[in-house]
């Protein structure tokens, strides 16, 4: 197994405190099958945590959308190793499967536009019936917070699910600081009680759904 560090940290004990980490959780098999979502590779996904299971959401993708995942990995690999993964073996012909439109979006510190943040804002602004959200951390940008509040005030059924217990008490306290203003706008808030909710998903009007590794916080959007 060829393992390479992404932006290697000199002091590993500080790695979880520094910005510009690679937060993506993707798997591509033979350029034809992809997996994406919130799951890391760690014992806790099998063993759970002290207060219950580790609840996450990951999806399997086939068809041309796999190219998007392969491209994201290839760019990161090239950045880290200075090697190009451009051979046809990595991008084989892939037939269309099913009838669902899938778009792969990535964001990072490089680039003029924040594709994931903008897509969330557009989808939320276009909602007519409901917005259902699962996220382990809720530290929204001002624009995202206002978009959710406006939707709820416009009689859209907005529901937010967070973990009752968090792996980061500090982040949990920060997340809870936003909840009063959400409740005042009519947003319904639920707490997952069977363990730690690590899933990052949004479903809107049974027409739009996003599943990935983006938390609803300003750090993920940047």
Identify the role of each PLM range:
Residues 1-222:
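Charged, low-complexity intrinsically disordered terminal segments
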């Amino acid at each position: 197994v060829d393992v390479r560090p992404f932006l290697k940290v000199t002091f590993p004990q500080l790695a979880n405190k520094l910005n510009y980490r690679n937060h993506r959780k993707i798997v591509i098999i033979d350029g034809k099958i992809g997996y994406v979502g919130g799951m890391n590779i760690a014992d806790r996904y099998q063993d759970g945590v002290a207060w219950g299971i580790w609840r996450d959401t990951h999806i399997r993708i086939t068809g041309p959308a796999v190219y998007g995942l392969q491209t994201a990995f290839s760019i990161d690999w090239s950045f880290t190793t200075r090697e190009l993964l451009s051979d046809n073996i990595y991008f084989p012909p892939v037939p269309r499967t099913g009838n669902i439109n899938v778009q792969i979006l990535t964001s990072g510190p490089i680039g003029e536009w924040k594709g994931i943040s903008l897509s969330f804002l557009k989808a939320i602004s276009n909602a007519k019936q409901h917005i259902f959200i699962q996220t382990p951390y809720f530290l929204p940008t001002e624009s995202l917070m206002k978009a959710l509040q406006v939707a709820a005030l416009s009689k859209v059924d907005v529901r937010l699910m967070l973990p009752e217990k968090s792996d980061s008490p500090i982040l949990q306290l920060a997340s809870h600081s936003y909840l009063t203003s959400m409740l005042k706008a009519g947003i319904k808030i639920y707490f997952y009680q069977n363990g730690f909710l690590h899933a990052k998903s949004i479903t809107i009007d049974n027409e739009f759904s996003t599943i990935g590794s983006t938390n609803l916080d300003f750090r993920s959007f940047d």
